[in-house]
């Protein structure tokens, strides 16, 4: 599943092409994806100008004139591609498996932009993605967003914030960090990497990073720095291309080449001076990769 850096890459690829364009017509080729489309969805968004494309956690938000927002989630295999004239482009494309079968083109947005007419096509073989319609003035209270934690890309994520969220928690640290109510958009790959960088065990009780007065310990300060750095590095690299991600220009992201522990079970730990071996365990149904020797 695409995580925050991959969705951010999609946003950055799509935005220059669609912002300011007129959404002439929305074409739905089936009544549902993971969930049914909202009633009269196609009619509600057609004829509206696209004001902005943004991201919150792992959601894309397409702001339309009039105050409506198309909320899109890519699920496991969703992709957006742009076809302009006879020359297809692939901004923000995700794919599973690599390549596209047009029978999985479920939504087509027909646009008229500054460079002419184009089609923005949503392709999703597994149909775990979805689209919904919300109002911008109440979107913070929407069920998708109201319980989300702070983003790992902004200044609001600091040690004091995370200490308040983790204080008293006995659950494993990795499990606590994957809770979207703690940090929005943070997923499995980047939690593993951040824990390795900060030298913290995924099995450690989350509350042990907070002192009795509720203040962050030094280990929590290091963790916050690692989370922010890992996410920034991944965005700069265009995300991680395992089987799900390709960049806006059709090239692959390359952060997976910088993985220190994720998907490296059995390899020597890359931390200088550590002679440990990367180990894979399962936590809450997900693979966790860590070095038991240097992560405490």
UniProtKB/Swiss-Prot annotation:
Cofactor binding, per record: Binds 1 zinc ion per subunit.
Transmembrane segments: none
Entry superkingdom: Bacteria
Swiss-Prot/TrEMBL catalytic activity: Hydrolysis of DNA containing ring-opened 7-methylguanine residues, releasing 2,6-diamino-4-hydroxy-5-(N-methyl)formamidopyrimidine; 2'-deoxyribonucleotide-(2'-deoxyribose 5'-phosphate)-2'-deoxyribonucleotide-DNA = a 3'-end 2'-deoxyribonucleotide-(2,3-dehydro-2,3-deoxyribose 5'-phosphate)-DNA + a 5'-end 5'-phospho-2'-deoxyribonucleoside-DNA + H(+)
Active site positions, chain numbering: 2-3, 58, 286
Binding site for DNA: 104, 126, 169
PROSITE patterns the UniProt entry points to: FPG_CAT, ZF_FPG_2
EC number assigned by the record: 3.2.2.23, 4.2.99.18
Cofactor(s) needed: Zn(2+)
Record flagged with keyword Metal-binding: yes
SUPFAM superfamilies per the UniProt record, alphabetical: Glucocorticoid receptor-like (DNA-binding domain), N-terminal domain of MutM-like DNA repair proteins, S13-like H2TH domain
GO molecular function: 8-oxo-7,8-dihydroguanine DNA N-glycosylase activity; class I DNA-(apurinic or apyrimidinic site) endonuclease activity; damaged DNA binding; zinc ion binding
Protein's GO biological process: base-excision repair
Zn-finger region bounds: FPG-type: 260-296
Pfam hit, one: H2TH
InterPro entries: DNA_glyclase/AP_lyase_DNA-bd (IPR015886), Formamido-pyr_DNA_Glyclase (IPR020629), FPG_cat (IPR012319), MutM-like_N-ter (IPR035937), Ribosomal_uS13-like_H2TH (IPR010979), Znf_DNA_glyclase/AP_lyase (IPR000214), Znf_FPG/IleRS (IPR010663)
Alphabetically ordered keywords of this record: DNA damage, DNA repair, DNA-binding, Glycosidase, Hydrolase, Lyase, Metal-binding, Multifunctional enzyme, Zinc, Zinc-finger
HAMAP family: Fapy_DNA_glycosyl (MF_00103)
Assembly and binders: Monomer.
Function per UniProt: Involved in base excision repair of DNA damaged by oxidation or by mutagenic agents. Acts as a DNA glycosylase that recognizes and removes damaged bases. Has a preference for oxidized purines, such as 7,8-dihydro-8-oxoguanine (8-oxoG). Has AP (apurinic/apyrimidinic) lyase activity and introduces nicks in the DNA strand. Cleaves the DNA backbone by beta-delta elimination to generate a single-strand break at the site of the removed base with both 3'- and 5'-phosphates.
Entry's family note: Belongs to the FPG family.
Protein name from the UniProt record: Formamidopyrimidine-DNA glycosylase
Organism for this UniProt entry: Sinorhizobium fredii (strain NBRC 101917 / NGR234)
Name of the gene this protein is made from: mutM
